[in-house]
A protein has these predicted regions:
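Acidic, low-complexity intrinsically disordered segments
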Residues: 45-104
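Short, charged/polar N-terminal "headpieces" of proteins
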Residues: 1-46
Length: 104
């Protein structure tokens, strides 16, 4: 019998976040996120106040499905052009880690 669940989580995971686009519908974009343990997540949340949107995203992301290359400059362009992007991405990250919306 194949085991599908492991106690050791993968170092990264992928999830889609809906990026708000002014004047239109939100667009789902797939991101690759860093995994954090429960204790690491608690510490990250405690120290998140005052962190810039760019720094927050650099702290949780390792990649994305966009045709633009992933990096600090591209993240800066993202948060400058789409003000709701950072909150949407961080919310999705936290949601995935705590499994808030898992259901039937």
């Amino acid at each position: 019998m194949a085991v599908k669940f492991k106690l050791e989580a993968a170092p990264t995971f992928k999830a889609k976040a809906d990026i708000p686009v002014h004047g239109g519908e939100a667009v789902p974009v797939e991101f690759e996120f860093k995994h954090r343990t429960r204790d690491e997540m608690a510490k990250w949340l405690e120290t998140s106040a005052g962190r810039s949107d760019v720094d927050s995203l650099l702290d949780v992301l390792v990649g994305w499905e966009l045709s633009d290359s992933f990096g600090k400059e591209s993240i800066e362009r993202l948060v400058q052009n789409y003000c709701g992007a950072a909150p949407a991405i961080v919310a999705r990250y936290v949601e995935e880690l705590i499994q808030a919306r898992r259901g039937n």
